[in-house]
A protein has these predicted regions:
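Structured mid-domain segments that build the active-site/substrate or prosthetic-cofactor binding neighborhood
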Residues: 298-391
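Extended, domain-scale alpha-helical bundle/helix-rich regions
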Residues: 447-481
Length: 541
């Protein structure tokens, strides 16, 4: 059997098909790519529908990642808590802190997990084959057989629980709860979350995927488990491989876990948000000794394009670099010259189904908002009239293309994240990894007036633009802390004697669990075999 590669070249498929079939997989497509320095293999697990992509490029630094589409339905941070919790021990590896133990012995070049607004990923990289396989198995066991299913202590530790202080007053505790209290005290995080809230009221992006401290305590252990079972399923899984991976061994590991499940039909679709104009205001805390004058942040935000329009998305990034990439960039220079703002920045978030832009003016002078917005209009209108500097556009395109072709390390992880920019939404996982055709189109755009028209669409058309004001406050922090205290006091006031005893027992069990060290037998499950030299498997043709 043969297949045509993307360059029209034929190559045999028999060995690859046999290898896949042996482990319950079916090869869907194989394409060669000069840009990827190898080929992309796509397959699916026949029983569950789990998808797998392998970028077979001979890289010694091998990457494995299992990813799930995770769509928040509220701001409890359930998927952030799950990301932490599944890595607190599993059926084969019942160690309380596998990360800590793995870092002591593994040769991993990357070892982490990440929660995004619409996905959660578990990537590892290693140059050592045996280490790579061990890491892949630990992660597969973590996501498909976690101890959270039997041990609620993990949820209480990583998510939230109530403790009583020395005076008997209730307090919220929990790793994610504390992490997000810190994150949400940062003004940049507040601007980011408010922007999502305003732009996306009708889909998952409007929720705080990391968790809002005001809403994290709304999550129950039962809800936590329901969301795990609904989303952490092979039918919703995407497995990404990159480099000189031992495919037969990886598929053996994967099949061991996938075969335990039956297919689920839920597709977890993301409805597209219809763009609209909106205005919003929020407060952020400053120190009691600080003056509130000239401390307002002004953000202009807009949905840019659907995920599939990679040319427009990349063009927007290039445009922002030309407009605000340095103090001499025309838009930033004009705004700073007014003396009415301290800094200007533009950003684009493209790791989602609907990439969006933000233009933020920091520490603007009180009463200067309309003047600054008019300066944006006047500057952009003048640039549209005269045309953007062609040399600046060319330089930015060249820099962007270099970054796309040389993504840095671990390159396999970056390819995985980029592939998910299309793959997660039903698109071609190869599309975001190929840059030659895209940059050819961008150069054609730069030769004409396409960038000028894009600039006008994004910055002059306010019919779909959101305006977010983030204003300083001496009382915001105190108000939030008082609100939390009042909530806890109300909860405590409603406790029955049975509730008090249940909390005491729960916290005693949690403390005992936390203070019980892993046994030698448990730690031995993570002992890794070290090989002095990286190994490269024989390629499967």
């Amino acid at each position: 059997m043969t297949r045509l590669g993307s360059q029209g070249k034929e190559f045999p498929m028999m060995n690859l098909n046999e290898t896949a079939a042996r482990h319950g997989f079916c090869v869907d497509r194989v394409r060669e790519s000069e840009e990827l320095h190898g080929k992309m293999v796509e397959m699916h697990h026949k029983k569950t529908g789990a998808q797998l992509v392998w970028v077979d490029n001979g890289e010694v630094n091998k990457t494995f990642c299992v990813a799930f589409k995770t769509l928040p339905e509220d701001s409890t941070g359930v998927f952030h808590i799950l990301e932490h919790s599944v890595l607190c021990g599993s059926a084969k590896y019942p160690v309380r802190e596998p990360f800590v133990e793995l870092m002591k012995s593994s040769m991993a070049t990357f070892l982490n997990a990440m929660t995004f607004p619409d996905k959660t990923i578990y990537p590892v990289s290693s140059r050592n084959e045996q280490d790579f396989l061990n890491l892949a198995e630990v992660y597969l066991d973590a996501v498909f057989a976690p101890r959270i299913l039997q041990d609620p202590n993990i949820f209480y530790q990583e998510g939230w629980h109530i403790e009583l202080d020395e005076n008997g007053a209730p307090l919220y505790k929990g790793v994610v709860f504390n992490e997000m209290k810190g994150a949400m005290s940062d003004v940049d995080e507040q601007i980011y979350q408010k922007t999502l809230d305003v732009l996306f009221p009708d889909n998952c992006y409007g929720w705080n995927s990391g968790g809002d401290p005001k809403h994290i305590p709304d999550l129950t252990y039962e809800q936590f488990l329901r969301m795990y079972r609904r989303y952490y399923h092979p039918s919703n899984a995407r497995i990404f491989l990159d480099g000189a991976v031992p495919l037969d061994k990886v598929l053996t590991l994967a099949e061991e876990y996938l075969s335990c499940f039956d297919r689920l039909d839920e597709k977890h679709e993301i409805p597209m948000q219809k763009p609209f104009a909106a205005e919003a205001e929020q407060a952020y805390e400053i120190g009691a000794e600080e003056d509130t004058a000239d401390k307002t942040m002004l953000t202009l935000a807009k949905i840019v394009a659907p995920w599939s329009d990679t040319v427009r998305v990349t063009a927007t990034e290039i445009l922002f670099d030309v407009l605000t990439g340095s103090n001499d960039a025309p838009l930033k220079k004009a705004l700073l010259a007014t003396g009415k703002c301290q800094d200007v920045g533009m950003s684009l978030d493209n790791a989602m189904a609907q990439p969006y832009m933000m233009l933020t003016l920091r520490n603007i002078a009180d009463g200067s908002e309309q003047e600054l917005r008019q300066m944006i209009r006047d500057t952009v209108q003048q640039l549209v009239k005269t045309g953007l500097d062609k040399d600046a556009l060319t330089a930015s395109i060249n820099s962007s293309e270099f970054s796309a072709r040389q993504p840095g390390e671990p390159s396999g992880l970056l390819r995985c994240i980029h592939a998910l920019d299309a793959w997660l939404y039903g698109g071609d996982p190869m599309q975001p990894l190929l840059s030659e055709e895209r940059y050819q189109k961008l150069r054609e755009m730069a030769a004409g007036d396409d960038f000028d028209r894009l600039m006008a669409e994004l910055l002059l058309d306010e019919s779909t633009m959101s305006i977010i004001r983030t204003v300083p406050s001496h009382t915001q922090g105190d108000e939030l802390r008082a609100e939390e205290t009042e909530r806890l006091q109300a909860i405590q006031a409603a406790w029955t004697d049975a509730d008090k005893e249940a909390l005491r027992v729960q916290n005693e069990k949690l403390t005992a669990w936390q203070q019980t060290p892993d046994t030698a037998e448990q730690l031995a499950t993570l002992s890794l075999i070290h090989i002095s030299e990286p190994t490269r498997p024989e390629p499967i043709s």
